[in-house]
Swiss-Prot record:
Official protein name in the record: U3 snoRNP-associated protein-like YAOH
Repeat (WD) residue spans along the chain: 158-197, 217-256, 259-298, 301-339, 342-380, 412-451, 457-497
Functional note: Component of a nucleolar small nuclear ribonucleoprotein particle (snoRNP) thought to participate in the processing and modification of pre-ribosomal RNA. Essential for embryogenesis.
Acidic residues bias spans: 44-53, 66-80
Gene Ontology molecular function: snoRNA binding; U3 snoRNA binding
Family: Belongs to the WD repeat RRP9 family.
One record GO biological process: rRNA processing
InterPro entries: G-protein_beta_WD-40_rep, Rrp9-like, WD40/YVTN_repeat-like_dom_sf, WD40_repeat_CS, WD40_repeat_dom_sf, WD40_rpt
Compartments where found: Nucleus, Nucleolus
Region described as Disordered: spans on this chain: 1-117
Amino acid sequence: MAPRPRKRVSRPKPRATSRGRGGGDEDPFFESEPKRRRGGGRDEDIESEDSDLEGVAAAAAGGVGDDGEEEEEEEEEQETAGEKKMRIAKELLKKVTDAARRRREDDEDEDEGEEAGRRRVADILLKRQFEESGRKRMELADRILQPDPEDGFKMLVKHRQPVTAVVLSKDSDKGFSASKDGVIVHWDVETGKSEKYLWPSENVLVSHHAKPPLSAKRSKQVLALAVSADGRYLASGGLDRHIHLWDVRSREHIQAFSGHRGAISCLSFGPDSSELFSGSFDRKIMQWNAEDRTYMNCLFGHQNEVLTMDALSKDRLLTVARDRTMHLWKIPEESQLLFRAPATASLECCCFIDDKEFLTGSDDGSVELWSIMRKKPTHIIRNAHPVFRNNLNSLENNVEENGIHKPESVSSAQSWVSAIAARRGSDLAASGAANGSVRLWAIEPDSKGIRPLFSLRLDGFVNSLAIPKSGRFIVAGVGQEPRLGRWGRVRSAQNGVVIHPIRLKEESEDL
């Protein structure tokens, strides 16, 4: 006889009750979980491009009231990551639609109907998508407005010794800087609030796989910094021949990578990976994995000290060295392209513009534009940072008979292009030296050349530059001395990190 089937009894679902934190026998951990998820997800949300300089814009507008800020924060806490993305997308669509409508009204084009307006909006959104994906170069240079005389560089973080490295997080909300005295600082771009990283004891460093120092005391002088794309890891390197890995959230030392026999002069993380590249005075370039804390590969090719590097992806790396060469490394293929500097120059710094073009700065004061299709520069700006005699502390009588200031020879240490940076995927770049200015450049399409934009006044050796994704400000690491030596000194300079706003014409005006 077949067994009788059991009846399935459906239990009623418990109703959600609004209890206090101490009421009932409900576990408060599960009660607060959704709220914590919503609040914690805010750091991972997509932010608008204008958020990079909210602090500077707020200061110019007079700030926002405390009540308004509290209401806005309460609204954001109730908003999930998906809802925020949808809200930002709707705001962008509304902004583009309104701009297209104003364009039609200004042109008084009665023949352009609603369908033509929709096509215009679709073209604008498609252009935005191509720019974000890197398939089209973002045009920022023509949107830059004349700098306001009251703008100028403002001190963001002070250091006691010359700053040697400055990097920004991927969302450009946070920055990191290091100086010759070994101080590493983590700071907020908007407020300037800073926190120091504390070096552990020698015993802790040895337990983290650091080799004992060659001298009686370990040198903590930092020459290079790099932050991972996810913002979890900070890497530092310097005279002690180790790459030190730090946890950004806790600011604690995690690991010390050993393998180089010379000072660590440059570091770079892959844009979308945990792979870390390091360059050293021992002429080697090494590849590490910060997530697994392992050594991966070693690249040979330079015949002298490696100075700077820039990683486009985990597959492409750009390096320059004192052997007057630049190498473009193709990591998976284990191959490299060799570029030689002009006869009068020794390359000092480099950066990617996109996957086809890159920039370098030289010790003869020139800025070079390179293409992957040519072994020589496609365009050279000579004497990009001229030095006048009144800027040289060691010289007097700096005026000729006709009263004209005479530029010093570009072989002066104050005219060396010591730092160069570009907003990746755009036509905006910047270079710095010790001649008293940071210069902004426009990169012409199809390797046609470099066009000067503006010169921003700044005293001291510009040892590092960084431009955020929005292109709305520029950060510089400044010191009285150059990054890798003491062959020059600008006594009027202040050691620290400075920031300068870049005012952009609204995109709606160009639609």
